[in-house]
Amino acid sequence: MLPRRQEYGMKRSGGARSGSVINFRSAMKLSSGRRSSAVLPSLLTFLVIVASGGLLLMIEKGMLNGMETPSPRSNGRRLDFHRGQAGGRSPDAADLESQILQEIRNRTIKTMCSHKNMPHSVWSLSLLQRKTLLQHVLVNDKHRFLYCYVPKVACSNWKRVLKVLSGALENVDVNIKMDHRSDLVFLSSLKPEEIRYRLKHYFKFMFVREPMERLLSAYRNKFGEIESYQKKYGVEIIKRYRKGRAKDAAITGDDVTFAEFVRYLLDEDVERMNEHWMPIYNLCQPCAVSYDFIGSYEHLESDAEFVLQHVGAPPHVHFPERQTWYKPVTTETIHYYLCSLPQKLLRELLPKYILDFSLFTYPLPNTTAAHCRH
């Protein structure tokens, strides 16, 4: 087990930090009215029982039978992560909240991935599953880490960091168009014995994001801004799902509605989806890979800094700041798009990403008719 980290806020030095701790950052937040209040120990017990027992019941009743791909697995470590007084909360309240959420996540992951139908190594995956995974894991031999990148979860910035660490870029702020293939080493390019060694001995991490927020980010970006996606996917979607347009040669694909996009997703096999909207568990297979750290998009800066500290990145290497043109997907935006969907589509969409919600402890969005009227 890695040593407990002290003084998280200290500046990085050239070598690996001796006072580090690995943890899974939970993205689920307690209600704002309780942020500064202590939580009774009995609540911890209750939530753990509900989370692990409820999901186990889902498995036993076959509610996840349609999800043939594996769900994430914890590496079994007891994990702590101290953020000091971030968000105005006292350290004690923040630590207790983190402890509760870590217990829920760890028990949930352990329960789901211990099921007999779940693979427990890269080599027990199907050929397609293993190909997808290995093509999404980036390797840095100098600092001995593996990073499973997830599109729409700051992966472009992480690729910049990897290029700086390898010497391909001078710094992360260089103003160039990101090439997502060059100067990067993918696990898929290595021999089986080289893959096994790195999976066993290297620090492994990934980052997650609220599933519907990630999906909306992909939809708005790819169909609103990227012409190649409009031509490749948009034209097909409109011809398939918009009445009277099946043979329309004038379709440009730049006006795909969210409902049309969702209909397309529901007809797609999750294992063959485009990586930008493929569920995270299909991309990174955390049941088959025991990740040492799972960071969250919601705490991107602090989680990224922790990773850089742990792998011993030089002090001048920092995680890039968000671009000035960045527009976050707000809670109101998610509410607007989801509530605009017919209830039938909504009921079918959420189960498509149910493992991303449950394993990474993201609460399902409230899409009841009463809530959507507000």
Located regions from the model:
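Membrane-interface amphipathic segments in extracytoplasmic regions
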Residues: 2-374
